[in-house]
Amino acid sequence: MERAGATSRGGQAPGFLLRLHTEGRAEAARVQEQDLRQWGLTGIHLRSYQLEGVNWLAQRFHCQNGCILGDEMGLGKTCQTIALFIYLAGRLNDEGPFLILCPLSVLSNWKEEMQRFAPGLSCVTYAGDKEERACLQQDLKQESRFHVLLTTYEICLKDASFLKSFPWSVLVVDEAHRLKNQSSLLHKTLSEFSVVFSLLLTGTPIQNSLQELYSLLSFVEPDLFSKEEVGDFIQRYQDIEKESESASELHKLLQPFLLRRVKAEVATELPKKTEVVIYHGMSALQKKYYKAILMKDLDAFENETAKKVKLQNILSQLRKCVDHPYLFDGVEPEPFEVGDHLTEASGKLHLLDKLLAFLYSGGHRVLLFSQMTQMLDILQDYMDYRGYSYERVDGSVRGEERHLAIKNFGQQPIFVFLLSTRAGGVGMNLTAADTVIFVDSDFNPQNDLQAAARAHRIGQNKSVKVIRLIGRDTVEEIVYRKAASKLQLTNMIIEGGHFTLGAQKPAADADLQLSEILKFGLDKLLASEGSTMDEIDLESILGETKDGQWVSDALPAAEGGSRDQEEGKNHMYLFEGKDYSKEPSKEDRKSFEQLVNLQKTLLEKASQEGRSLRNKGSVLIPGLVEGSTKRKRVLSPEELEDRQKKRQEAAAKRRRLIEEKKRQKEEAEHKKKMAWWESNNYQSFCLPSEESEPEDLENGEESSAELDYQDPDATSLKYVSGDVTHPQAGAEDALIVHCVDDSGHWGRGGLFTALEKRSAEPRKIYELAGKMKDLSLGGVLLFPVDDKESRNKGQDLLALIVAQHRDRSNVLSGIKMAALEEGLKKIFLAAKKKKASVHLPRIGHATKGFNWYGTERLIRKHLAARGIPTYIYYFPRSKSAVLHSQSSSSSSRQLVP
């Protein structure tokens, strides 16, 4: 890497350059895909660029250089990483352990990909609550032979002392822009781990500044890029747009540490992605709010530097206003009922309503992103109102629920997936959608890029349309253009091999710019007080659609709502021949001054009339932002009572509507499920609940059922030694009881294997029930098991109680007592109806901390005490075990020979 004139700028070359020049280079033998298959790679055919990536990673490992795999989102960084593990274990006999840190939202995806691509590598998912993780820690300490440990950033920080105890061969950090701050707790904590090789995965290796880039470099190679030299790095490369020599040097510097490929270069077969911006008008209500927000704090415009926080707050409030005025408290009219007013109050939702109707009729499926979870709430109400099927993921949704939502969207014909850009834009694979809509834009364009990549990625077989909704003549225009300009600069430098952004602008300039941004478009926006929501021809803008696919590659027309062609490659503030880059237009400035003068006049008038000026920002539009300054009339007790009554009636009505909607949704889901079962010729073996049994069974047959068992000995538990899969029964039917989880995956060993030897039905029926979503906690599957062998008299049946939960991370819960009790109630009804005996293993045997005493009481309460002959089996593993079992039994627990 020797470069002519390396020290010409600033004298002595920085330490990181000198150290890099002296680094040795090791060579790794080239890896072929057949080698990886021989070592255990399954379920995937690596593309040529992915195989190149694996070889590059192997080379970095041999050089002992940590590195950054910065491929564009959707190109398969996960499979390349797993292939590296297979290479290390297969060729180098390096069996780890390997540590993977990732966001909670993709934890299950990593687990599934490990099982799919590398089933020969054992993978432990380190997740759960404090108690569950404590149990995992004990297991890992006693049996630490695993290849991969998978966990989240948050759990890593909580249990850092435990995870530090392992000598990690490889540390993988997914979505590694979390490490862009050298001073962050995660950066500092991971720097203390014992790691041979660090690998960072990020589709956005450069987001904002040189400092963030250096933070990633110092993490993967702290010896080369010391934290103290970040200033030297920034100073040396801050003007690379102007200095080609500096850019070339930085390119060479980064080559050993950063590999980035983009879809346009390596995935040419990937269907096309087209981006369209559609502009919308504003409702009269939105315009009123827009004015009021601007006038709420005039002081912020008079001293920009000192009032930066206030200006940012004004910008945030204006963006909320452009989204929907109902985001402000007290605006939505009472009683709170969903109706057309939702779309009439917002120009954005008015356009979205037309857009979704167009997409729904065309058979498209949509990812709908917003910055604000409150906006997602409004969109969710809208989806219910229009009857569109949807899933939702935002920052409040737990990992297990996220995985289920993603799975449902992939497997069922759900129309819309509602996502928050930050929480839903990372790591998810949602290629079932072919349309992405941004309700609002992120300040950081990389976040929107990641979000769009949920649909446009490897595995997508349809063209993808990305649609961005922008409020015309509002702050949204400037936010979007700033982001577009920033992204254009980033792409120019990264894809050119330069990998970085220029220096940050001075803070004062940014503040001045913000104060001007807020005035943009006022002349046109406030030219009238009425609504500017227009009807547009969506097909002419979006292009032709056929059979649920976008088929037109023509550029969208610039009519109606789109301005893409007008903008071209102009400056980000240059529209229609006017340059807004340094200051707003004369017309915008004049409109703002008129608003200010009007506000001051109203304030003076209010002062003269003796009104309180505490809420001076609300004078322009009373009651709109912080409440009215107008003195309220005191209501009489009767009027107060009447108002309270109306509010209670409205609340009760809304609750009824919600309950009715919930009931209808449950009925629709049940009906859909029944139709699905019927189409698959599936018949459920689930027992009904105690409440659903007919009264004649509960009452009329009770005497005859219980008179048969009047002997006191018959109402106590009987303990026997033997194999529960071959019940010691007389001529009556026998119900064999076994507890399973709700995953639908049949277990191995113990009673699972014994039942398979007895009958082929248990595995087949249980796994089919799992596929048909017929397993729920407290449920019981009951079916005969006499297909291989049977008694001369009486029938043997197996009752599988779903008493355990296995989450999406493959973590199995203990036996849930409530589910067990519910299952025992159902078994009682079945045994009573059949006049059968019940035969159970010692449930929870050898499970640490299991409450056998409580379980025994439940069995006695719901079975034996209610007249059902009930047997508990001790399985004799050896003669000594049988003798020990017999000697330790009390008189109340006599073994039945």
From Swiss-Prot:
Segments of this protein annotated with the region Required for ATPase activity: 615-673
Activity control, per UniProt: Adopts an inactive conformation in absence of DNA damage. Binding to poly-ADP-ribosylated histones activates the ATP-dependent chromatin remodeler activity.
Effect of R857E: Loss of auto-inhibition, leading to constitutive ATP-dependent chromatin remodeler activity
SUPFAM superfamilies noted in UniProt: Macro domain-like (SSF52949), P-loop containing nucleoside triphosphate hydrolases (SSF52540)
Region Disordered, residue ranges: 628-654, 687-711
Listed Basic and acidic residues bias regions: 642-654
Variant or mutagenesis effect after changing R611E: Reduced interaction with histones
Gene Ontology biological process: chromatin remodeling; DNA damage response; DNA repair
Modification Omega-N-methylarginine, positions: R9
KW Nucleotide-binding (keyword) present: yes
Enzyme class per UniProt: hydrolase
Role noted for this protein: ATP-dependent chromatin remodeler that mediates chromatin-remodeling following DNA damage. Recruited to DNA damage sites through interaction with poly-ADP-ribose: specifically recognizes and binds histones that are poly-ADP-ribosylated on serine residues in response to DNA damage. Poly-ADP-ribose-binding activates the ATP-dependent chromatin remodeler activity, thereby regulating chromatin during DNA repair. Catalyzes nucleosome sliding away from DNA breaks in an ATP-dependent manner. Chromatin remodeling activity promotes PARP2 removal from chromatin.
Assembly: Interacts with nucleosomes; interacts with the acidic patch of histones. Interacts (via macro domain) with PARP1; interacts only when PARP1 is poly-ADP-ribosylated (PARylated). Interacts with CIAO1.
Protein name: Chromodomain-helicase-DNA-binding protein 1-like
Species for this entry: Homo sapiens
